[in-house]
Amino acid sequence: MVDIIKTNATFKAGKGNKGTLSFEIPAKQISSGIDQAFNKQKDKINIPGFRKGHVSKELFLARFGEEALYEDALNAILPDIYDQAVNEADITVVGQPQIIPDDLKHGGPWKIHAEVTLAPTVELGDYKGVEVEKESDEVSDKELNAELERLQKGEAELVPAKEDQVSEKGDTVVIDFDGSVDGKQFDGGKAQNFSLSLGSGQFIPGFEDQLVGHKAGDDVDVKVTFPKNYQAKNLAGKEAVFAVTIHELKKLETPALDNEFAKDVDDSVSSLEELKAKTKEKLAKDKAEKNKDAFEDAAIQKVVDGAKINPEKLPEEMINDDVSRQMQTFFNNLAGQGVKPEMYFQITGTSQEQLKQQMTEGAPNRVKTNLVLEEIARVEKINPSNEEIDKEIKSLASEYNIKESEVEKSVSAGMLSHDLKVQQAVELIVNSAQAVEKK
């Protein structure tokens, strides 16, 4: 039989969505907490004549006093008591409370005050049958031709340019270059037979542009200014001249769009018409999937935009919690791919602070979306069954190739139930949404 704890909880509203939750911890729970605190501390206490961990509770209390156990006792029992007090006061809170013990005395009850932040309230707008624009899944001739052109470029080869041809963006030149600043050479400013794709942005701004319009064999003086934030501080912001010799000019030659090309691209077809049909079918499938995702996102966003949140400014605690979860999920995904955060930041040239800023920008909408979906689940009385939770555990175990017991250890039943509630609220919105043709 479950032992119901009575906390005599009361809530006093403060400014905005802040307030004070006052409650009591009964003697029975205090006694349990003191026992837990003693068991935690006894292994660390040195008392002459006793081995560590073998001192009696009576001797401990006589020597140090019961008050020495109060802090650990409170930490041990507070989480469950606090949850009960929140339920008793019939409030919904977010973030971590600021706990202020008021009267911790022998035998109790202990009086506690908790400065808390109330969750925003949600006033739903329409969420069933919302009208949302949807793109056509049909593939146009323009889209098909663009994809065939992409396939052509994928099969293109670099070939030597003709004598009368000049360089253009997209061409490749093989060059020698020798750079100088104020007439003096500098480290890293010289190379031979360097292959450069014009327009690739490999060199500092202005360098590649000045090699456009030339032929193989030309000598060109390229005049540029190093960016002020250039990594080599001794060159940053300075003017430079590069003596460049163009040894070779190569142009991309794309294959003809014919039956032979079709067979080279896909050995399962024997003609260009077959390739076109297969390509169009794939494009249609991809487009339908993309349009479906966009339709679902737009339907959810329309419902979220139509809801009113009070207060409109979301609690900072909710934003911070969301960002922390997003960061943790991101790092977990990296770990699953065998990538350490330091390696990721090095490869991408970003930092953890930049990633956090990126996550923070989307946090308000994510939090509002979650609040709205939770309210829909409440109004619609969506409560996942034990069978649905078990099915989700099996699904996660299969997806991540781990045992079901490992899923249960890492994700609580409450979290799974919440995720399923939100998921089913999403399905309710999407399944009832009305698609209208995009104008």
Swiss-Prot record:
Domain notes: Consists of 3 domains; the N-terminus binds the ribosome, the middle domain has PPIase activity, while the C-terminus has intrinsic chaperone activity on its own.
NCBIfam families, A to Z: tig
Species in which this protein is naturally found: Oenococcus oeni (strain ATCC BAA-331 / PSU-1)
Family designation: Belongs to the FKBP-type PPIase family. Tig subfamily.
Keyword Transferase among UniProt keywords: no
Function: Involved in protein export. Acts as a chaperone by maintaining the newly synthesized protein in an open conformation. Functions as a peptidyl-prolyl cis-trans isomerase.
UniProt key word Cytoplasm: yes
Reaction equations catalysed: [protein]-peptidylproline (omega=180) = [protein]-peptidylproline (omega=0)
Pfam family, one: Trigger_N
Protein name, per record: Trigger factor
Compartments (UniProt record): Cytoplasm
Gene: tig
Top-rank lineage group of the source organism: Bacteria
Alphabetized GO MF terms: peptidyl-prolyl cis-trans isomerase activity; protein folding chaperone; ribosome binding
